[in-house]
Amino acid sequence: MGQELSQHERYVEQLKQALKTRGVKVKYADLLKFFDFVKDTCPWFPQEGTIDIKRWRRVGDCFQDYYNTFGPEKVPVTAFSYWNLIKELIDKKEVNPQVMAAVAQTEEILKTSSHTELTTKPSQNPDLDLISLDSDDEGAKGSSLKDKNLSCTKKPKRFPVLLTAQTSADPEDPNPSEVDWDGLEDEAAKYHNPDWPPFLTRPPPYNKATPSAPTVMAVVNPKEELKEKIAQLEEQIKLEELHQALISKLQKLKTGNETVTSPETAGGFSRTPHWPGQHIPKGKCCASREKEEQTPKDIFPVTETVDGQGQAWRHHNGFDFTVIKELKTAASQYGATAPYTLAIVESVADNWLTPTDWNTLVRAVLSGGDHLLWKSEFFENCRETAKRNQQAGNGWDFDMLTGSGNYSSTDAQMQYDPGLFAQIQAAATKAWRKLPVKGDPGASLTGVKQGPDEPFADFVHRLITTAGRIFGSAEAGVDYVKQLAYENANPACQAAIRPYRKKTDLTGYIRLCSDIGPSYQQGLAMAAAFSGQTVKDFLNNKNKEKGGCCFKCGRKGHFAKNCHEHIHNNSETKAPGLCPRCKRGKHWANECKSKTDSQGNPLPPHQGNRTEGPAPGPETSLWGGQLCSSQQKQPISKLTRATPGSAGLDLSSTSHTVLTPEMGPQALSTGIYGPLPPNTFGLILGRSSITIKGLQVYPGVIDNDYTGEIKIMAKAVNNIVTVPQGNRIAQLILLPLIETDNKVQQPYRGQGSFGSSDIYWVQPITCQKPSLTLWLDDKMFTGLIDTGADVTIIKLEDWPPNWPITDTLTNLRGIGQSNNPKQSSKYLTWRDKENNSGLIKPFVIPNLPVNLWGRDLLSQMKIMMCSPSDIVTAQMLAQGYSPGKGLGKNENGILHPIPNQGQFDKKGFGNFLTAAIDMLAPQQCAEPITWKSDEPVWVDQWPLTSEKLAAAQQLVQEQLEAGHITESNSPWNTPIFVIKKKSGKWRLLQDLRAVNATMVLMGALQPGLPSPVAIPQGYLKIIIDLKDCFFSIPLHPSDQKRFAFSLPSTNFKEPMQRFQWKVLPQRMANSPTLCQKYVATAIHKVRHAWKQMYIIHYMDDILIAGKDGQQVLQCFDQLKQELTIAGLHIAPEKIQLQDPYTYLGFELNGPKITNQKAVIRKDKLQTLNDFQKLLGDINWLRPYLKLTTADLKPLFDTLKGDSNPNSHRSLSKEALALLDKVETAIAEQFVTHINYSLPLMFLIFNTALTPTGLFWQNNPIMWVHLPASPKKVLLPYYDAIADLIILGRDHSKKYFGIEPSVIIQPYSKSQIDWLMQNTEMWPIACASYVGILDNHYPPNKLIQFCKLHAFIFPQIISKTPLNNALLVFTDGSSTGMAAYTLADTTIKFQTNLNSAQLVELQALIAVLSAFPNQPLNIYTDSAYLAHSIPLLETVAQIKHISETAKLFLQCQQLIYNRSIPFYIGHVRAHSGLPGPIAHGNQKADLATKTVASNINTNLESAQNAHTLHHLNAQTLKLMFNIPREQARQIVRQCPICATYLPVPHLGVNPRGLLPNMIWQMDVTHYSEFGNLKYIHVSIDTFSGFLLATLQTGETTKHVITHLLHCFSIIGLPKQIKTDNGPGYTSKNFQEFCSTLQIKHVTGIPYNPQGQGIVERAHLSLKTTIEKIKKGEWYPTKGTPRNILNHALFILNFLNLDDQNHSAADRFWHSNPRKQFAMVKWKDPLDNTWPWPDPVIIWGRGSVCVYSQTHDAARWLPERLVKQIPNNNQSRE
C-alpha cells in the first residue's frame, strides 16, 4: 500500500509541475481526489506504472463507460476537465511548440552524437519514468531511431533515456560492453502479443524501412535543463571519439590469433543477437569458418559473428547436449510446465531458434503425446500470428513461421529477420505453456483446492497455472481465480481473508495468508489477521511491552523467580502432607508414583508433562475441542478457586479451540463430570475478562442429579477468538437446592443431554380464538394461527374455483387423516395489513370448519411466542435464544417455508379436524398426464440379436441402479431397442408411439427460442446447464405403469423381465412440456425474489443476467438451492461465468453475439431432404446474419421440383458460391445486445426480391426477413414492405416487449400518403403506431447496402381508360384456343394449355407483344387477370406455381420494356347488354369456340354426365334416352359408385299430399367437414325436395338458422316432424314454430323409423357427397359448402323418377289428382263407407287413406279398403 501511495503522490507532483509549465494551475488536493477517482474506475491503472497516450485514452474510455452506467451524479464535476488537460500534456501532437522545439533539438543532438557507448547508466528508479510522450508522427518516429539500412561498418547507435537526475558511472554497475542497450526484446514481444484480439488494426510490428520505438522522457522543463544535458553529451562525444581512435590503433597492432574487438563483441566472437537495432547483412552459412573457443551455454543453432571488416556472418550449430539433458531432466522430474522447466525453456528461447530447431528440441525432450500436443498448439499460434502479419503487410506468412513449404530448409530459415525469430519464439513458448501439468489428468479449475497445510501462495500458483491452460492467459480469468482463491482455500485462510475479501486483490490475499502454516499455527494466524497485522508484526507488537507479568503475584516489572512476595510467603518451606492421590504416604501429588490408591483401586495416569515422556495432550481441533481420549473423568471436587475468597469454581476448556462468529454457540468440554455435591445445584457464568475479549459465555443451570460432563456454552461475538487449553473462561457457582412439594415430571436425570431442566413455555390461554386475516393473491382469507401445524390449509369452500389445484402424494395426519389431499398448483403471494409478503403453497381440504395458518407461513411472518414471565424469558435467553433471530445456533432465523418432515408415530383419534397437522414430506414429481382412455396398450417386444440384447441388458441394469426404472407388472407394454452411436456406445430407446396416441398432448409452452439479443447491454451473465434433466424429474406415480417395457431372452429361455420408468422417458410426447413446467416451478421463487434479474429458461438451459455482479452471484446461489430442493442437478463443467459464453448455438462475447463456427458438409447434400434441413438451419440463423432473401435464392431454387424427399438434388455454381458466403457470414457477422435506455430503430432496406429489416442501436441487433415464398403469387414491393413493418412490430413486442421508437423505410412522405390511400396493407401496417415513420437512414457503412434495390411505383399501367388508344378484347377457352379482336380483325391461335385463365393470359401476352409502342385499352372477361396484371409492375418476386409463374414473368418483362402506358379492364361475359364493349367481348368469345368434328353419341353424353354428377341409372335412361341395361352398366363400371349399393325400403312414412304440407327434419354428422360437420337436413315428404345447411352445432339457434334458410327457398311448411332432440323440444323452438303457425310434432322417442324419410335422405346425401368428393371438378375441391351444394343440385334437379320428373319438378309442378288412386274404405268406429278418398300409401297389408272429411290421414287394414275406378264420381 505504501508503494502504491508513493507512486500516486509522485504522479500528482509531476503532473502539477508539468501543467504549471503550460500556465495551468491546479490544487494538489484536487489532483489527489481526481486520481482517487481514477483508481476507483480503473483499478489496473496504478499497477501499470506509466502514463502514456494509449493508457490515458483507455482511462477516458473507462470514464465514459462509468458515466453511461451510473449517470452524471456519480462522476466528479472536474473529472473530464482534468482528463483533457493531462491528455493535452502527454499527447505530443498537442504539446507546447516551444517544448516540441526543445525536444526536437535534443533528438538531433542525440542522432549525431550516439556513435559510441555511453558509460553512464540510466537510473534504476522506476518511479521516475512515469509519463511518456508518444509521437503519432511517422517521421518523428523514424528519426528517433537509427536507420536500419546503415552501413555495416558503423557502430550501433544507442539512445539513452533522458533523465532529470545527474547520471554518473556507478562502480558497481556491470561493464557497458556486457549490456545490450538495444533492449528491444520486450517491446518486440509486446508488438507480437499473441493475446491481442485477432481483427484489430494495429501498426506493423516491424517496418523494414524505418523501425521505430517510442521515445521515453520524464516530464521535466526542457528549457531549464536542456543546456546542461547538451554539455554532458558533448563531453561524451569527445570521449567516444578518443575511444574509437584507440581501438583503431590497437587493431593495427594485433598479431596471430589475437583480436581486439569493439565493446559489442568483447565477450567473444560469436554471439546470439538480442534484437539488433540495425540491419545486418546476412551471409551464407560458413561451415568451414574457423570457430573460436566458446562456452557450452552459448552454443545455439543460429549465431552471428562480425569480422574485422564489420561483415555479419550467420552460423547454424548443433544443440549442446548438456542443455537438452538438463531440459529433459527438468521436464521428467518436475513436469513440462513446472517453473524451473519454463525458466530453462525461456532461457533457450532468448536465442535464435529456427522452426526446425524447435521441433527437434521438443521431440527430444517431450514424450510422443506431448510433442504432438505442442506441435498442434504451435501451428495454431503460428496461424493466428500469420493472420496478423497479413494485416500488417510485412510478408511473414504461415510457411515461414512453421518452416514448411519453400522454407523447409535450414539455409532458408537462417536468413529470417530478427522480428520473425521473435514471433517464432513467442509461438513456441506459448505452445509449451499449454502442455498438461505433470500428474494432472486435466482437472477443472473448480477442482483445485488448498490442502490443510499447503501454503496459500502455492495454492494460488496452481490456480493461476490451471487458469492459464483454460483461458489462454491467467489475466483473462483473474476475477474467476480471485473468487476461487477464497472459496477453495482451507478454513484458516478463508477466515483470514474474509474481513478483507472485498477490499483487496489477489496479491492482498497472498499477503494476508503468508504466515498461515500447519494447523498448530492457525489460531495465531487468525488472531493476527483480524487485528490487521501479519503474524510477525503481531508477535513483535506483543513483545514491545516492557517487562512481563509475574506469574506469582500478577504484577508487572519482574518475573516469578524474582518475586519478593512469593519469597516472603514461602520463607518457610512447607512440608508435604498426606498424598491426595494415593492416600498412602506424605509426598506431593505430582511426585506420587503409585499406581493404586489405599483401597487398591487403579489410579489414572498423571496429567501434564512428566519425566517418563511427553504428555498425552488433548486432541486439537480447529473448530472446537473434544475431550482427549486419554483424559479421565474428573469430579467436581477437582475444581479449584482463583482466590480464597472466590465464589465460583474455575472452568476451563480441555483443548485449544478457535471460535468464529459464523459458528454460533459451541459446547466446550471441561472434563468435569457430575453429580454435584448433595443439596446443591450449579450456575455457570462467564468471566468478565473473557467477555471483554469478545467471547460470550451463556449462563446455564446444572441440576443436582446430572451425572454427565459439564460443558460451557460459548460463542465468538464479532471476531475470531482463540480459547487456549487450560485458560479459565467460566465459573461454576454452587447454590443451595431448596426442595418443594411440586410434582416431579420426569425420573432421575442421570447422564441425559447437557443443559438445564426442561423449560415449559407459558402462554395465557383465553376464550378468544387467535385469528388472522391475510390476502392470498389479493383475495382475503381469515384463519386460525396454528403453531402446531406444519403447513397452511384452506378449506375448499373458500377456495376460488378458477385457482388450479393438483393431487399430492402425501398424507395429512392429526386428529384424523386426509389421504392425498389437494394442493395449490402454484405458489401464492401472501400479504398482511402491513404489506409484508411472501410465498406459500397451501393445501386445500373440503369440509374444514376454519382455515389454518401453519408454520410454513408463520415462520415467514417471523411470529414469536413470548411469555410475560421474566423468569421464563431469562431461561430462554440462557438457552441461547435471541428475540427475532430464531432458535438455531446460528441465530439466522428461518425465512423460507419450513421443510415438511414426516412423523410416522402419530395416529388419528376419530373424525378429521386437527389443531396440529403433521405432513408426510411430499415427493416432488411432474404433473399427471391426461389420458384419452384407460384401456391398456400392449405392443409385443421385437426380437433382438444377441449383441443388441446384451447391450440392452447392460443399459437396463445401469438405469435400474440409477433409480430411473423399477420392476413392473403393468398391463401396458411398448417395445425397446438399442442403437450404436458414433462413439461406439449403445443407446436405449423405447417406441412410445402407441402410448403417445392415447394421451392428450400438451401445448408448447415456448413456441420459439429466446433470443440473446434481448438481454440488456452491459449485464453480467451466468449460464448453467442442468444435468440429465429428464432423468431428474420423477413421473407422476399414476402414469408410471403406462411406460412399461419388457426385456426378452433368446429362444424364450426365461420369462421376460418387466420394468417401468420412474422418470420422464425420452421420446414421450409430453416430456419436453413437463420438463419445462417442472423447471419453471423450481425457479419461480428465484424469479419472484430477484425481479431485477433477467432470467431466461429454455428446457435445461438457464441464463441469469444482471447489472451488479455480486447480486448475480447471490441470485445464482439461491437458484442452486432451489434446483437442489427440486432434485435437479447442475452440470459443474457447464457453468459459464465469463466471456465468451456459449448459449443456444450462439457465442456471447462482451457486447457481441456471434454464431458458433460452422463448416457446411457439401458432400452430404444429395436429396431434397438434405437441402430442406440445411435451409431450415440457415433460416434459423438469418436473424443474426446479413443475408437477404435474394442472396439465398439459388439455394431456395433447389427446393423446387419433385416433391419426393429422396429425389436427387445437386448444387449449381451459384449455390456452391452461396454456401461459401454463408460460411463467411456465420464466421464474421455479429449482432449486439439491446440497450433499453436508447431508442430502438427498425430499418427497412430495399434489397432484391424482398425487403430486409434490421433492429438497430448504433450496431445491428436483429435482422428480420420475410418468408422466402411470398404469400401471394403477385405481391407488390410496397405491400411487402408493409408486411415487413407488421412483422417487425410483432418481433419487437415479442422479443423486447416494446414497439420500435422509429421505423425507417424507403418511401417519402408523399409516397406514404399515396400508399395509405391506394393500398390495403399500409393502413393496417401503421394502425395504432405512435412512433416516428421516417426515411432518413443513420450514417453507417453497414447500412450502405440498403441502396441495392430501386423501388418503383405504377407508371405504365393506367388505372383509367386512355384516350386515343387501340381497343382490344381478349378471351381464352379451356380447349386451348386463345383469341383477341380489335376493330374488325380477329386473331386466334391454339395453345397447349387447358386452363381458360392461362389461355387468356397467353392472349394478353400476344397483344402486348404485337403492339409494344401503342397505347392500348384492353378488356378481358377474366376478373383474375384484370386484377393481377396491374400488380406485375411493382412485384419484385413471383411465387412459383407451375406454368403460371412463367407466363407472369414473361408478361412482366413485356411491361418493363414498354414506355407507353396501357389500360386493362374487366367486362362480364354473356351479359347480353348492348354497346361496343359487350359486342367486342362476345366477338372474342365466339372466336374461341370450336365446332366439334363429330357429334357425341347419347351413350358418350351419358358417360360424361355420370363422370361429372354420378347420376343413377334411372336418371341416365330417361335423360339421354338410352336402354336401361346400358345405364346400369355405366353405373356398375364407375369405380366410385360400385361401392354404394341401393338399400331396400322396408317401410313407409306418412307423406304430404301437397308441397309444403309435411316436412321431416333431422341432423346428421359428417366429420370430414371439421367445424361444419353438423348437417341440418329438411325434406318435403310430398316431392322429396331436399334442403340442407352446414352448421357449427345442433342447438336451437342452429336449427332456427337452418329453417330460415329453407323458408327463403321453398316457403313455410304446415307441419314439421322431428325427433325428440333438445334442439327441437326447447321452449324457444316451440315459440318459433308457434309464431309462424307451423305445427310441430315429434316421433316416438328413440325410434328412428318414425323419421324414415329424412333418415334415407341422410344416406342419399352422404353417398352423393362421397362420390363427388372424389371427382376432379374444380368448384367442389376442398370446400365443404361447394360439395354440399353440388350434392343437393344432383338430388333435387338431376335425379329423375319413373315419370321422368325430378324432385324440383314434383315440388314446383305438382298435380295431385293424377297421382293418387281413389278408394272407398270402411270406418271401423261407425261401420260407414265414406268414399271416394285418395290413397297416400299402399303398403303390405295396410293402406294409408287421406280422409277428405276429417282432413287427416287414416291407416286402415287392406281388407277394409276397396279400390274404385279413378273418375270424377262424387261422393254419395
Swiss-Prot record:
Gene that specifies this protein: pol
Annotated spans, Disordered: 113-149, 258-282, 593-626
Domain Reverse transcriptase, first and last residues per copy: 960-1148
Cofactor: Mg(2+)
Binding locations of Zn(2+): 1506, 1510, 1534, 1537
Propeptide boundaries: 101-162
Protein name in the entry: Gag-Pro-Pol polyprotein
Active-site residues annotated for this sequence: 786
Domain Peptidase A2 span(s) in chain numbering: 781-857
InterPro entries referenced in this protein's UniProt entry, alphabetically: Aspartic_peptidase_AS, B_retro_matrix, B_retro_matrix_sf, DNA/RNA_pol_sf, dUTPase-like, dUTPase-like_sf, dUTPase_trimeric, G_patch_dom
All copies of domain RNase H type-1, residue ranges: 1362-1493
